[in-house]
């Protein structure tokens, strides 16, 4: 998923929306980001020990990046989309 796609799909959502990522059968909270090895894409880091990052925190950290930046999971797989849970948190897949 490109950064611009995420912005377009979430433009009417609350900026307090929490971010989660699903890998296989587990759903963990997105707690940090880091650059991928190519230094242009972003990896979403998940952890269940701390508070989940919100949509506003993610956009604040990524605001200087190009719109074509790709979002990746921790195992460097591209994120293809997301769905909402029953509390309207974003779960990336």
Would you name each region that the model predicts?
Residues 20-93:
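Detector for the mature cores of small, proteolytically processed
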Residues 1-18, 23-24:
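Long, hydrophobic N-terminal alpha-helical segment
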């Amino acid at each position: 998923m490109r950064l611009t796609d995420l912005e377009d799909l979430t433009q009417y959502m609350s900026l307090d929306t929490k971010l989660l990522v699903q890998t296989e059968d587990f759903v963990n909270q997105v707690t940090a980001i880091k650059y991928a090895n190519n230094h242009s894409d972003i990896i979403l880091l998940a952890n269940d020990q701390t508070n989940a990052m919100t949509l506003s925190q993610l956009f604040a950290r990524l605001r200087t990046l190009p719109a074509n930046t790709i979002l990746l999971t921790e195992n460097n797989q591209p994120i293809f989309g997301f769905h909402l849970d029953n509390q309207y948190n974003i779960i990336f897949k």
